[in-house]
Curated annotation (Swiss-Prot):
Keyword tRNA processing belongs to the record: yes
NCBIfam families named among the record's database cross-references: TRM1
One Pfam family matching this protein: TRM
GO molecular function, a single term: tRNA binding
EC numbers, comma separated: 2.1.1.216
Name of protein: tRNA (guanine(26)-N(2))-dimethyltransferase
Keyword Coiled coil found: no
Gene: trm1
Alphabetized UniProt keyword annotations: Methyltransferase, RNA-binding, S-adenosyl-L-methionine, Transferase, tRNA processing, tRNA-binding
PANTHER family xref list: N 2 ,N 2 -DIMETHYLGUANOSINE TRNA METHYLTRANSFERASE (PTHR10631), TRNA (GUANINE(26)-N(2))-DIMETHYLTRANSFERASE (PTHR10631:SF3)
Species whose genome carries this gene: Methanococcus aeolicus (strain ATCC BAA-1280 / DSM 17508 / OCM 812 / Nankai-3)
Amino acid sequence: MKYITEGNTKLKIPEDATISKKDKIFYNPIMEVNRDISVSIVQSFLNKYDRDEFFICDPLGGSGARGLRYANELKINSGTGAPHITIGDINPNAISLAQENAKLNNLNNVNIVHKDANVLLSENFRKFNVVDIDPFGAPSPYLDSAIRSIITKNGILCMTATDTAVLYGSYRKTCIRNYDATPLKGNKELAIRLLVGHAIRMASKYDIGLKPIFSHFTAHYVRTFLMTERGAKKADEAVDKLGYVKNIEEEYIIKSRKEGNSDGFCGLYYLDNLTDENITKDAIKIAEERNYSKESVKVMKTVYEESLINNVGCYDVHKICKNIKKKVPPVDILMSGLNEMGFNACRTHHNPHSIKSDAKLIDIVEFIYKYDGNK
């Protein structure tokens, strides 16, 4: 075992974790950025929707890193109080270590239980303000229980999926089984939109609408934060934002859910904005003030810039140039050129070779031809 500090929280963790389902105790150092973003987004949400009491559940707690950071670093009642955290895990070794870590940080606002995640969530119907599902693989086995355990208005469902190849379209049949959706291959933004769409459909049967406030595809995982909205009308509004997408040589064709599916289209995808701009701006400020990882700030800033261009999909410049057999312009030069043509453009957080823009594919191709001709 060794001791580290993550954020403002001390943790005792395994010396050599292999990061697999077979680990006796699960701690993933790569996910520090994930946890930095999580604390920042939830704190930003708390700043907007402050309460006298706030209950959070981390039902797949592992060593307790995520739940204990929530307990130690989140503030309620305008900074005078702390939330109540429930951490669960089915692994007794993980529970013992989480308890040690709670003592290490002198936390008395944490309840640590040895229990299956679905059992823990099912025993706490409509109790939690936040439920954070962070499994090894797909979140779908826990999603129904999680939705039923969250308050139906102004709660947050936080969800990680590490089966990115499934969401990314490499395993079509598995995606249909796990997410009841047909994936398009090779687009990380659409992987996020597919996960969000699945959660919206799951929540709608309980007359709960889900509205994404922040989402990202970083490293080996997809992560999303969804706010609950109460009532059949809100559920219907969320479902109406789902639809189908078709990709023809990097041009995205969109069809609404009401138009129905047809050959070549995949989905259902969430087709509206994935980001709450105000919550994200505040989260960036929080992360900077607390000296969280530079990478977490970078991800949030880029996601914020993407949110200002509210459309579906992005352009992979390398793929476009390969299709038209032209030289690849530097991304910064391409974005400047599009700006001069009157379009908005920014980098994406998930692919250094792609941009998000309100330009059409033909406009981007036109610039690439001019760039190639001048070389």
